[in-house]
UniProtKB/Swiss-Prot annotation:
Limits of the Glutamine amidotransferase type-1 domain: 46-241
Entry superkingdom: Bacteria
Location of region: Anthranilate phosphoribosyltransferase: 253-589
GO biological process: L-tryptophan biosynthetic process
Organism (species): Thermotoga maritima (strain ATCC 43589 / DSM 3109 / JCM 10099 / NBRC 100826 / MSB8)
Keywords recorded for this protein, A-Z: Amino-acid biosynthesis, Aromatic amino acid biosynthesis, Glutamine amidotransferase, Glycosyltransferase, Lyase, Multifunctional enzyme, Transferase, Tryptophan biosynthesis
PROSITE patterns: GATASE_TYPE_1 (PS51273)
Reactions catalysed: chorismate + L-glutamine = anthranilate + pyruvate + L-glutamate + H(+); N-(5-phospho-beta-D-ribosyl)anthranilate + diphosphate = 5-phospho-alpha-D-ribose 1-diphosphate + anthranilate
GO MF annotation list: anthranilate phosphoribosyltransferase activity; anthranilate synthase activity; magnesium ion binding
Protein known as: Bifunctional protein TrpGD
Role played: Part of a heterotetrameric complex that catalyzes the two-step biosynthesis of anthranilate, an intermediate in the biosynthesis of L-tryptophan. In the first step, the glutamine-binding beta subunit (TrpG) of anthranilate synthase (AS) provides the glutamine amidotransferase activity which generates ammonia as a substrate that, along with chorismate, is used in the second step, catalyzed by the large alpha subunit of AS (TrpE) to produce anthranilate. In the absence of TrpG, TrpE can synthesize anthranilate directly from chorismate and high concentrations of ammonia.
Disulfide bonds: none
Catalytic residues, chain numbering: 126, 215, 217
EC number: 4.1.3.27, 2.4.2.18
Length: 589
């Protein structure tokens, strides 16, 4: 872990050195204010380090201070700063540290690369290097060898951060994962390789964004300080301000769309960021959404838009990597009872946290928010209350209007359009808890592969995009289509309820009441096992797929059996009561 507390500021003096591990570390003083320039009027470098909870952060900070004595360094853990807060600090350089796990587990790191690449010079070290590869669409795979504190010879191209560096150089490696060369994005180029053929250096072809898989800050790495110095010597690129040039991007995007040309993931991100920052006019937003629909949205376009929505949302910290969501697109018009919401309580009863993202009615007569509210659930919570509830009960409803404040910029255009737009598809894949396991119901099978691609681009671990034929839920009323989505592949499947030991159901029994209180009573009856077989087994089928996705059960059939047991034993209904009783412990809003 990095020295001192998260979010500390270091102002280096000429010739400073760091030693010790307290907040009063020798060689620097902590200052509360900005450090835009020194008393002599020289503009100072501002370096923000994203700390991925790794002890090497200390060494990186020390090296930065030694090679650039007149600089300001601020260190923030990867879950304790937002994109907007970084922008306000106007850094001249950003460093993404090493750390445990994979890029998609590294908090804000991936979003930092996607947002600031091309605006601010970025250096990623080890995990940070993998973050860069992943952020632009590369795959992170197991290395040929697991190395911990071992040295290798690194051959490099002598450019960028390797300018003037000994070639080959001996470098220290601590990693079990690498960026896969076969899936390397077109925008990235390899700048260094190890003697065993692994990628050791990357650089964006157009941006000052660099990654090194090895540790330049290790004492056993040759010329590590020169690599750091080369990075810091890159001419500062200030964060782009809203300008006419930015507006041209949305106009250019519109021109492409009306010619039925697809946008890339990054292009859709740029347009979405412009829109969600409040810089687009209602006419531009409406034109973009209509043109996108007329051309037909792609998975990359939806993924790019969703990634910005996630960045702009209020982040909810999940209590477990296995936290799931059961949110669908709605829009099927069939008017089913609240299947996905009921499913959530069965899943939570098994000890798997459910961060249920949702809103009021879309296609059902009563939306998930409506039915929960009818049972006494408090929708208006602070983010801290949601996190606490999720941790203590295993369930929390993430009421979308509270957690997506940037949506205010698009609502006027959406209200005036009154047609289906890309935003009708984005809800399920923009969960503020950044869940990695989901069952995403889709009202139209033609959108399934697009949402699957978007989920893959967003870093899902193991999710399913499903369609029940006449509804955006899995049902026992016929065969269901399912796309299994992992980081490596998208696999189509057909689920036949009868092959899972379930009886063919009657679609009419899935229709729900129009009164929220009656809808809540129906949910209670299903969770008690007192509802019709079609209703109970449909919920069990959806929960069973979740159990299979998160690895709770080896097969979907086993998952269905587990779900039925949780209903029959009363555990599912008990979880509902626990969550509703928990609401009484919360203050009135």
């Amino acid at each position: 872990m990095a020295p001192g507390r998260s979010g500390y500021r270091l102002r280096f003096r000429s010739g400073a050195r760091i030693s010790g591990d307290s907040e009063q570390t020798q060689g620097f003083v902590q200052e509360p204010g900005s450090c835009a320039e020194d008393p002599g009027g020289i503009v100072l470098k501002r370096v923000i380090v994203i700390d991925n909870y790794d002890s090497f952060v200390y060494n990186i900070v020390q090296y930065i201070g030694e090679v650039e004595p007149d600089c300001e360094i601020e260190v923030f853990r990867n879950d304790e700063i937002t994109i907007e807060e970084i922008e306000r600090k106007n850094p001249t350089h950003i460093v993404i540290s090493p750390g445990p796990g994979r890029p998609e587990e590294a908090g804000i790191s991936v979003d930092v690369v996607r947002h600031f690449s091309g605006k601010v010079p970025i250096l990623g070290v080890c995990l940070g290097h993998q973050v860069i590869g992943y952020a632009f669409g590369g795959k992170i795979v197991h290395a040929k060898r697991i190395l911990h504190g071992k040295t290798s010879k690194i051959v490099h191209n002598g450019k960028g951060v390797f300018s003037g560096v000994k070639n080959p150089l001996v470098a220290t490696r601590y990693h079990s994962l690498v960026v896969e060369e076969a899936s390397l994005p077109e925008v990235l180029e390899i700048t260094a390789k190890s003697d065993d053929g692994e990628i050791m250096g990357l650089q964006h072809k157009e941006h000052p964004t660099f990654g090194v898989q090895f540790h330049p800050e290790s004492v056993l790495t040759e010329e590590g300080k020169r690599i750091i110095k080369n990075f810091l010597n890159i001419q500062d690129i200030q964060v782009k301000k809203v300008s006419e040039e930015t507006e041209i991007d949305i106009v250019s995007a519109l021109k492409k769309l009306v010619e039925f040309e697809d946008l890339t993931f990054e292009e859709s991100r740029q347009v979405m960021n412009f829109i969600m920052s409040g810089n687009a006019t209602d006419a531009q937003i409406a034109g973009f959404l209509v043109a996108l629909r007329m051309k037909e949205e792609t998975g990359d376009e939806l993924g790019g838009m969703a990634s910005v929505m996630r960045e702009k949302s209020i982040h909810i910290k999940a209590p477990s990597p296995r936290t799931v969501d059961t949110c669908g697109t709605g829009g099927d018009g069939f008017g089913t009872f609240n299947i996905s919401t009921t499913t959530a309580f069965v899943v939570a009863a098994a000890g798997i946290p459910v961060a249920k993202h949702g809103n009021r009615s879309v296609s059902s007569k009563v939306g998930s928010a409506d039915v929960l509210e009818a049972g006494g659930y408090k929708l208006e919570k602070t983010p801290e209350e949601m996190e606490r509830e999720l941790k203590e009960t295993g369930f929390s409803f993430l009421f979308a209007p509270l957690l997506h404040p940037a949506m205010k910029h698009v609502m006027p255009a959406r209200r005036q359009l009154k047609i289906r737009t890309a935003f009708n598809l984005l809800g399920p894949i923009t969960n503020p808890a950044r869940v990695k396991y989901q069952v995403v119901g889709v009202f139209d099978l033609s959108f399934a592969s697009k949402l699957a691609t978007a989920l893959q681009r967003l870093g899902t671990e193991r999710s399913a995009v499903v369609n029940g034929g006449f509804t955006d839920e899995l049902t026992t009323c016929g065969k269901n289509n399912l796309l299994l989505v992992t980081q490596e592949e998208i696999v189509p499947m057909v689920l036949d309820p009868e092959e899972l030991g379930l009886k063919s159901g009657d679609p009419e029994e899935l229709k729900g009441p129009s009164d929220p209180k009656e809808a809540y009573r129906m949910m209670e009856s299903v969770l008690k096992g007192e509802a019709s077989r079609t209703q109970v087994e449909t919920v069990a089928l959806n929960a069973g797929v979740v159990f299979w996705l998160v690895g709770e059960c080896d097969t979907i059939k086993d998952g269905v059996g587990k779900a039925l047991d949780l209903i029959r034993t009363g555990e599912a209904y008990k979880k509902l009561r626990e969550v509703m009783d928990y609401q009484k412990t919360l203050g009135n809003s």
